[in-house]
């Protein structure tokens, strides 16, 4: 997927350039809001976005204390865990989540990453040189990836 930017609204207290968030979708309080389309119309549920610019105007919002600001966002890069043998910079792969139910593991959130779905294509931008001690003995590497369009 390209790094094309989208315009949306986010709580003023969260509106900081470089900030990242996962869009969780519309809530009941948004149903009759005049800004509903701008807040929710451009984003995909479950995706992680990075704020690249913040506009100064503040708008009222019944959900966000302090109102909301207009922000420009792009899809954020993701840090995920993959099998070591597949961890090569520049490679494009289909996402295969690491099967793990050890919620207490320090790596759990990387093996079960939010923002990417099983089967989606991604490109490895960087292999992180970090020693991973998987409690189940899996040979894993932490990588930074960007989503790519399925063609």
From Swiss-Prot:
Membrane spanning residue stretches: none
Coiled-coil ranges (or none): none
InterPro entries for the chain: UPF0179 (IPR005369)
Superkingdom, taxonomy of origin: Archaea
Similarity-based family: Belongs to the UPF0179 family.
Protein name according to UniProt: UPF0179 protein MJ1627
């Amino acid at each position: 997927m390209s790094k094309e930017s989208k315009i949306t609204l986010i709580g003023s207290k969260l509106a900081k350039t470089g900030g990242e968030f996962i869009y969780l979708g519309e809530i009941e309080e948004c149903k009759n809001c005049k800004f509903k389309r701008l807040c929710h119309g451009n984003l995909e549920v479950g995706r992680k976005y990075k704020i690249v610019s913040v506009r100064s105007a503040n708008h009222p919002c019944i959900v966000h204390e302090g109102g909301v600001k207009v922000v420009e966002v792009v899809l954020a890069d993701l840090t995920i865990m993959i099998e070591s043998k597949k961890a090569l910079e520049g490679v494009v792969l289909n996402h295969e989540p690491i099967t793990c139910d050890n919620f207490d593991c320090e790596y759990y959130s990387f093996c079960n990453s939010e923002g990417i779905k099983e089967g989606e294509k991604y490109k490895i931008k960087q292999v992180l040189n970090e020693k991973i001690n998987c409690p189940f003995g899996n040979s894993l590497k932490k990588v930074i990836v960007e989503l790519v369009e399925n063609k």
